Structure formats: C-alpha cells, structure tokens
C-alpha cells in the first residue's frame, strides 16, 4: 500500500477532530486510537482506507472494552462520504441540516430571550449519563434541540451556529489526514509551540522553499533551528514523500554538540533513508575542519589479515576508532570539497557574520534564503550583503495570508488570525570577475559617447 494515498501500519497521521483540533497518532499494529471524549477505535479497522477519509465511531450498546487507563469505550467505525456530511450545520454549509428540517425558526431574534440554562430542560447530569451510556452524539444533540424551549425563536443562521457548537462537543467522528510538513506546522501552531518553530508560518515555509529552488538531485546547505521542520519540508520537495532511489543530500549545520532534528520522527522516512540523505556537521567542524594529514596520522585502518589476528576484546575499540576516522573524513568532504546548490538559514545566531561565512561554499548563481522572526535582524544582514560583491540584490520579504470566513450573504476576515509569519531575506551568490570585466570606469562613464561638434571657423 502507498503511504501517500492510504492508511498503512507504523505510519504517523494527523487526526482532525469534530472541534477542528488536530492530533498526531501513530498507527501501531493491533493498537487503539483514543480521542478522549470523542471516543476510541481499533487501528486495524481503518487500515487500507484512503487518506482524507472521515470515520464515525458508533456503538451497538454491548461494548465493554475500554482504553487502558481510562473509561473511554472502544467502538466500531464506519465511513462517511465526506467531512462536510458529518459537519453539516457549519458556517460554510449551504444545504439546511437534517436536524433542523423539522424545527420552526424565526426571521429575527427580537422575541428571543437569552436565559442561558433556564431554557434547557436537560440538565448536566442527564447529558453526562447519556454520554456514559455511549449514546450516539446525534441522539444527544436531537434531544437537546427538542428540550430547548426557545429554539424555534432563533433564526436559521442562529440555529446552525448552535448546531455546529453542539456537534463540535458531542459528535463522534474524525478525519485521517496525511502528516506532511505543512500539517505538522499547523499542528505546532495550534498547540501554541511558537518558540520551537521560530514563529514560522506555512506561507513563509513555502516561500523559502520556492526561493531556494529546492528540487531532486540537489546538494543543499541548511541551518535549521526549528527542530527539523525545514529539513522535513526539503525532503518532501526532493523526494516527494517516497524513499526514492535518486540522489540528493541535505547538509545540516548545527551550533550544539548534537543536531536537533526531533520532528523528523513524525515523517514517514526510515532512519536509514534519513541517515543517507541528511548529513550533520557542527559549526566548529564546518568552519575549522581537520586536515587529511591529521586524521590519517591519528589512525590507520587495518586490512582483513591484520583484523583476523586482532584479539576479540580489542575489536570493539578498533571499530569505534574506525567509525570516528570515517566520520572525520566525511566532515572534511562536506566542509571543504563540496559546493552547494543553495543555502537556507533559520537561526537565532548573528546572521550578519554567520551567513557570509556559510555562503563561501555555495556555488555561483545559486540562491541564499534566510528566515528570522525579527525584521531588524535581516535588515542588518542585508546591509552586510550589500557591501559585498559576492551577493546580488538582497531582498527582504514578508509573507502574510489573511483567511476569510463566509456565511450566506456575508464575507469577512477571520477575527482570530495570527499576527504574522516572520520575514525572509533572499539573494543570489555571485562570483566577481578577477580581470575587471564588467566593471564601470566612473571617469569614462561621465565622458560623452561621441566628440562634440566643432563650430565652423570664421573665414
């Protein structure tokens, strides 16, 4: 089965709940998907269905199996046609919900008195009892509508808003979506983990990949302090979500002892594939790599005959030193012998001194893209790049997407949108000519293109 099209085992997916909140779930064999108050189901029951399928959790009434460590009853699942069918009554829905076809409505809310819980005959205890009896969410909502004394005095639009709120609270369905870099970014934003991703927005991430011209078979230099989110997006651009056989390498430079690529665990790439195409080098190793003579002087690999004669208790130390030897040679190759197709930097370090040094190994006529959540940081960097002949046309960009919400006859922006998504600086690495070609002589530039006409001599 194709993990980009279908739900497969040992895959991380993004589950969208009735409340539109997101949750990351790993599909372990014979496991259970627990969604809290929205119910639970077995993983094996959804395997093989296409990604994007909406499932409804339902109960026959005799279920006794519960999630370990909780009181959530595990139910069965059935497929809904689409999420809009389960979410009828939302603001964007055009047809009238089935729950409201038998209910009267009012043209205005003039006769409606907002008395809160006093107009609802069902109290909190009865609703909790129905939830414990695993009553279907639609049944609970229908009983609440029937028990509402002033529901018929609401307008159609007000009734749909009421129905939407109740579905977000009591409905038992979910949508299984593909967990890509964009979905992972939306999950982290919703979770409120903004410092971890440096206030990065989905629009800024896509713009950075486009400006850097990320594609397959490329070799890219990256400094990612978003936990591996940018590296994950680059892998998707280069390999399309598949563990393809074609080439391509991402060299990640990190400032700490070990790289922080924790978010790559949510990708569907294996550790072997990531280790083959993602190489990590510390800043100290990149700027001051050891020489080949120093590495070869510190260790000499043994041939097969010498290795067979070595005692078994010394082979462990030998293989550790051999691994370090090969690692040092790899660092020398990455830091000294490769020119890169692009540079992407998302770091909290001083960019005005960091980027010019990192760009030294970028090939000519290749893009350089830097991200920061602060405009002043990139302004300082742009002044530094303008003073150098190795960088062409540094440009500062700001991405902003303004979502709109619609109802019948109305269109207005979403009132709870984010403030911004950071800033990007983009330029090209160029190699100045050594022989003076292309330079303009200021003195000659001011001279006229042709000699001025002389006045006729007097006879």
UniProtKB/Swiss-Prot annotation:
GO molecular function: RNA binding; tRNA (adenine(58)-N1)-methyltransferase activity
Origin: domain of life: Eukaryota
Coiled coil (residue ranges): none
Cellular component, GO, one term: nucleus
InterPro entries: TRM6
Region forming the signal peptide: none
Keywords assigned by UniProt, alphabetized: Nucleus, RNA-binding, tRNA processing
Protein's UniProt keywords contain Cell wall biogenesis/degradation: no
GO terms classed as biological process: tRNA methylation
Entry keyword Amino-acid biosynthesis: no
Subcellular location: Nucleus
Function per UniProt: Substrate-binding subunit of tRNA (adenine-N(1)-)-methyltransferase, which catalyzes the formation of N(1)-methyladenine at position 58 (m1A58) in initiator methionyl-tRNA.
Subunit structure, interactors included: Heterotetramer; composed of two copies of TRM6 and two copies of TRM61.
Family: Belongs to the TRM6/GCD10 family.
Name used for this protein in its record: tRNA (adenine(58)-N(1))-methyltransferase non-catalytic subunit TRM6
Originating species: Eremothecium gossypii (strain ATCC 10895 / CBS 109.51 / FGSC 9923 / NRRL Y-1056) (Yeast)
